[in-house]
């Protein structure tokens, strides 16, 4: 029995109403644990860095040149397998903190988990759209953002940071767009931004917003106001624990499914054209998609 399974069992004992979600998470974990991490080939690639509005390359656009079968295979594997490893590393501590009633660290880690799942869903969405359009133009910018994007980019002009960065490292994907992709992927026609709202709630805990520390204070009514007492240990909120576990289950299902769909894509060159074959799209090459 793994640490995660034991934590889920203990959580279900404390909160019997969560037993169904806890069991569902255990089943997803068992399935993912059996998935292979197959090695893949990563080719040397060239990134074109354009000058920005101020005539420098710091804020310029970055595009991968020569996007072919090897580049796309490598990219989809990086995103899918990197997402899987990141998500799995977060799940045990998330459940552990929920079990201990420590909602703040659980929600902060859950936010990161949701972001990782969202990246896989966003890349799947953009890849599918590109295949249907028969063009990789949009992927030329997306690939470096997902592989070489860094938050340090905004500090590039500082010597101490500039020495750490390579010229091809630039902007990251817009996380709100990625969360929207995750919501659309999971809920399909019923998508109405539920995960976008959940993500905003998680941000309340990750950012120094007052809503995130409410469980650390006790308010007692006094004439004309309240007496506020802060305590170092937060009081457990059963409703928040339930919502956290439910969101984790959705994030796991959606993130791992998106990653596996990315891995299912196949790319090859035929008659000088790129041919991409993936779920729901069939085989596409340089024009409107047709199904083999």
Give the positions of each predicted feature.
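A cross-kingdom marker of C-terminal helix-rich interaction/assembly modules
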Residues: 1-115, 119-125, 129-292
């Amino acid at each position: 029995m793994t640490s995660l399974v034991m934590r889920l069992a203990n959580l279900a004992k404390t909160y019997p109403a969560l037993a169904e979600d806890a069991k569902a998470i255990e089943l997803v974990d068992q399935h993912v644990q059996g998935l292979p991490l197959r090695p893949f080939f990563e080719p040397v690639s060239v990134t074109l860095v354009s000058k920005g509005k101020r005539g420098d390359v710091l804020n310029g656009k970055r595009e991968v040149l020569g996007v072919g079968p090897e580049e796309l295979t490598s990219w989809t594997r990086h995103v899918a397998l990197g997402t899987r490893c990141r998500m799995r590393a977060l799940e045990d501590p998330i459940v552990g903190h929920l079990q201990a009633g420590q909602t703040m660290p659980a929600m902060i880690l859950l936010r990161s988990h949701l972001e990782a799942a969202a990246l896989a869903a966003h890349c799947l969405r953009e890849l599918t759209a590109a295949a249907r359009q028969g063009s990789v133009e949009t992927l030329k910018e997306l690939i470096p953002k997902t592989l070489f994007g860094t938050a340090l980019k905004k500090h590039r002009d500082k010597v101490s940071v500039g020495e750490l960065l390579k010229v091809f490292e630039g902007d990251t994907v817009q996380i709100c767009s990625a969360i929207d992709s995750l919501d659309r992927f999971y809920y399909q026609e019923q998508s109405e931004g539920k995960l976008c709202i959940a993500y905003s709630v998680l941000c309340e805990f990750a950012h120094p917003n007052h809503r995130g520390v409410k469980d650390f204070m006790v308010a007692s009514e006094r004439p004309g106001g309240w007496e506020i007492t802060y305590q170092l240990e937060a009081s457990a909120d059963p409703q928040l624990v339930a919502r956290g576990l439910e969101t984790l289950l959705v994030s796991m299902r959606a993130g791992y499914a998106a990653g596996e769909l990315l891995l299912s894509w196949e790319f090859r060159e035929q008659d000088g054209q790129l041919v991409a074959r993936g779920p729901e799209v069939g085989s596409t090459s340089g024009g409107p998609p047709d199904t083999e």
